Amino acid sequence: TSKRLNNGFIRLGHNVLSISDRDITNNNKSINDFKGIKSLQNTVINNFKNFKPDLVVLGHADTLSLDTIDYIKDNNSKITQWFLDPVGNKSPDYKKNKARILDKSEHIDTSFITSDPKSLDFKIKNSFFMPNPSDSSFETLSNYRNDSEKDLFFAMSHGVHRGSLKKGKFDNREIFIKRLIKKNNNINFDIYGMNNIEPIWANQFITSLAKSS
């Protein structure tokens, strides 16, 4: 997602500096900084001082501290965040995702989420709906040009980048998908992440998606 957004910013003529909190924390763990979080704060602040951005865009930056965010705000930069995980009260990990999106919302200028803010049972300050970003350099398939062997593709998982189903886990999305299948015998479905069919990722995801209309 961040690469798609960055590509868009660059195409619009903006200068973009990208920082991966995961890479920094993973590469800077030590006895004095067990999770690499201190190194992350220092890296972000030092880059902020050197780059002097007009806008700082956060994406699921859970390890960025509120002190670091307040430092950025105090130095006259705008801050926004995007959040793609579901935050509806019937969605997976509702309580966890709600806490994550609210953690920084009072300290930043705006939040962009893939759920309609009006549909939520809680309020996110200065929040706006955004669709899942797409970019022609990533979305390379043109399925509409082909006669596909499958009609409808759907894939989910029991957690971001989780490679297998959780034992005993039930996802409410299964209810809708099963109803859809039951009511549409004439549609050839290709479903992953439920009915004991494991989730798919990376090239396997693209290969399977390419077979559907």
Positions of PLM-derived features:
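A short, histidine- and acid-enriched strand-loop-helix "catalytic/donor-clamping" loop
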Residues: 81-94
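Acidic (Asp/Glu)-rich catalytic clusters
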Residues: 71-75
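Nucleotide-sugar donor-binding catalytic core of glycosyltransferases
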Residues: 1-31, 37-43, 51, 60-66, ...
